[in-house]
């Protein structure tokens, strides 16, 4: 009886260890995929943005990460669709940022 209980404990422990290792491996793979995607995104941004525009986008990312992510995704989509023919300079990026910010901004009005 005691041997059976000990055997069950060992089996349970091995199952838990196996699950833990599988979860850890899945997390590592997800992190690796995320890092690869970020590297690809950064490479595309280097191709389509001037250094000044990349700098501005980096500063925006510090203050409004959601806005910066939206702009990055939009630019990648346009790039992949072949709609970006020349590098985007700082002035163009400002206009894009303003337009997307205006679209996504919510105005709250408090009525008395």
From Swiss-Prot:
SUPFAM superfamilies assigned: Double-stranded DNA-binding domain
Listed InterPro entries: DNA_bind_arc (IPR022889), PDCD5-like (IPR002836), PDCD5-like_sf (IPR036883)
NCBIfam families, alphabetized: PRK04239.1
Entries under Gene3D superfamilies matching the protein: PDCD5-like (1.10.8.140)
One GO term describing the cellular component: cytosol
Pfam families on file: dsDNA_bind
Lineage: Archaea, Methanobacteriati, Methanobacteriota, Thermococci, Thermococcales
Entry keyword set: DNA-binding
MF-aspect GO terms: DNA binding
Domain of life: Archaea
UniProt similarity note: Belongs to the PDCD5 family.
Protein name: DNA-binding protein TK1278
């Amino acid at each position: 009886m005691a041997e059976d209980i000990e055997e069950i404990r060992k089996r349970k422990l091995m199952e838990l260890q196996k699950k833990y290792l599988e979860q850890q491996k899945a997390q590592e793979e997800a992190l690796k995929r995320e890092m690869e995607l970020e590297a690809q995104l950064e490479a595309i941004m280097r191709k389509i943005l001037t250094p000044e525009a990349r700098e501005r986008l980096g500063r925006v990312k510090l203050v409004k990460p959601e806005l910066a992510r939206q702009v990055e995704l939009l630019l990648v989509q346009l790039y992949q669709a072949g709609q970006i023919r020349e590098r985007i300079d700082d002035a163009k990026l400002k206009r894009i940022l303003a337009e997307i910010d205006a679209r996504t901004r919510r105005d709250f009005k408090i009525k008395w």
